[in-house]
Amino acid sequence: MNTVSGERPSPHFVSREHPLSHYIWGDQCDGWNLVDNPELSVKLERMPPHTAEQLHFHQRVRQFFFILKGAAVFETEEGRTEVKAQQGLEIRPQLRHRILNEGEEDLEFILCSQPSTIGDRVTIE
């Protein structure tokens, strides 16, 4: 097995039932860490109906959201964009953004961040 000091053996199996870790964020939203290292973060997240995250940006992180279930609305300084199931949206560094679930069903999506967002989130009041 190839391993880097401090990392799990690769490859390793992860799923919603067997994530690296689970967390609650925002207004009762769920997140499951699937890949979590300084170079790359991959998360599965769930937002209940009528929830939204805070407007924010990342100094150096590029993100890609891929919608699995439901429809997301992204608000950015460039406007509003609806992204439906089986569609994705890239967010470049320093772009103010937030994701909303304005629908009547749970929103589920994969979120890839490169590098990791740890220490790189600036919340806008």
Regions found by a protein language model. Give the residues of each.
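Short strand-connecting beta-turns/loops that link adjacent beta-strands
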Residues: 39, 60, 104-105
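Structural motif
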Residues: 71-73, 80, 96, 106
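Short acidic-glycine-tyrosine-enriched beta hairpin
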Residues: 78-93
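Histidine-centered metal-chelating micro-motifs
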Residues: 52-54, 73, 89, 93-99
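Short, conserved beta-strand element in jelly-roll/cupin
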Residues: 46-47, 57-73, 112
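Ligand-binding loop in jelly-roll beta-barrel domains
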Residues: 93-119
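A short, N-terminal "cap"/entry segment at the start of jelly-roll beta-barrel domains
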Residues: 1-43, 54, 121-125
